[in-house]
Amino acid sequence: SKYCVMNSKGDIIRGKPARDFVFYSRSGYSSTYYKDWIPDLKETQAYAAERGAHVIGSAGAKDINGWKDICRTIEDCGLPMVELNFGCPHPAMMPGVHGGSMIGQEPEVAYEVTRQVCESVDIPVIVKLTPDQSKPLAIAKAVREAGAAGVTAINRHTGFVVDIDTGQPRIGGPAGIGGTWVKPLSLRWVHRIHEELGMPISGSNGIFDHRDVIEFIMAGATIVQVGSILMVKGIKWLPKIIEGVEAFMDEKGYASVDEMVGLASRRSVKDYSEQFSRNRVHAVVNPDTCKNPTCNICIQVCFYEALSQNPEGSIDVHTDNCIGCELCLDVCPFDSIEMKETAPAQFDQGFFNIPEGIFEHDKFGTRRNNMDTIRANSPKFNKEPAE
């Protein structure tokens, strides 16, 4: 194995990792035969059971017999659940190996491996998904149909990092990459799977502290996995995460984790037509706290020409251009901007509004980007045959 922990600039950290750390790593073939783990698994499971905890086994193999044998061994050791790792990015770099994320990119293979494992054991089976594909939802559907009790969303991406001072790739070449920066990407799939399939989810990839754990839960995860941050900060970081979650629940009045599961996912819009049909807002600038012209960052970042400086040096808001995107609100360092709801009467006064009918279905359905409509509307495919 090779590990490389970097800051957001790509430099190796020297000391405690910041919240935006990047964890770049590569693991090779296991040097330990899986049956050599049996004493440790039994001891760990007994220790956990005495303390009301659970141990979930993790399996990866090069052929179907290996998958079944390892999972049966995990069950025989008394573990209550096993995870099939269809997300590991490393097998793609191992000559002659077809496993990990390679299986996780093929719905048919993922289905069959999951089906045979589920038939071989009596404990619940979950599947760890890979982000190195365009359709994790399809894999989640396939493994659910094959008998999986849930999925883990989501494993590490495959990356490539360069040391520009030496011109060399970090740790030799492509490797798995994760860290808190990837959390929004992970949360996307947690949300989608929760929304579309409603199946149990173990959230993973992007956790630093308790606030990240809570985000995963509110996106739809029923449990979470914490790995990279424990490797760089030590196992003693885990109790701090748990304590933080408990303190947050007490502060906000949540009686159980179940009350938080999928909370944000259920409140999410389904598509952009719903997003823009909600109440319109516009920016309002407080001249008493605004520091323009010393600071005019809001004017600089507004792509819609909705803000300008008037002759007196204060900020004018052009409500006919302000679409309510809130970028000025986010970048203002003096908290001088707020967004106010646009009243219906203000639209008649020229305040910006979404043009009527813009999201009508036929506007998007007339020419879809598929081969049938492309061919139908392309002169190349519609030439009369030569006589």
Regions found by a protein language model. Give the residues of each.
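Extended, hydrophobic interaction surfaces within ordered domains
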Residues: R192-L197, D212-S268, V317, I323, ...
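N-terminal capping/small domains of soluble enzymes
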Residues: S1-R72, E384-A386
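Flanking helices and flexible, charged tails adjoining ferredoxin-like Fe-S electron-transfer domains
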Residues: A247-A255, E259-R278, P287-D288, I297-I299, ...
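C-terminal helical cap(s) of enzyme catalytic domains, especially alpha/beta-barrels
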Residues: M6-R19, V162-G178, I229-Y254, D348-I358
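Short secondary-structure boundary segments
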Residues: S1-Y3, F86, N155, S228-I229
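Alpha/beta enzyme core
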Residues: E50, K62-S202, F208-I223, K270-E274, ...
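C-terminal accessory/binding modules appended to enzymatic or scaffolding proteins
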Residues: N279-E312, D316
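Short beta->alpha connector loops at strand-helix junctions that form conserved
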Residues: S1, N205, G227-S228, K340
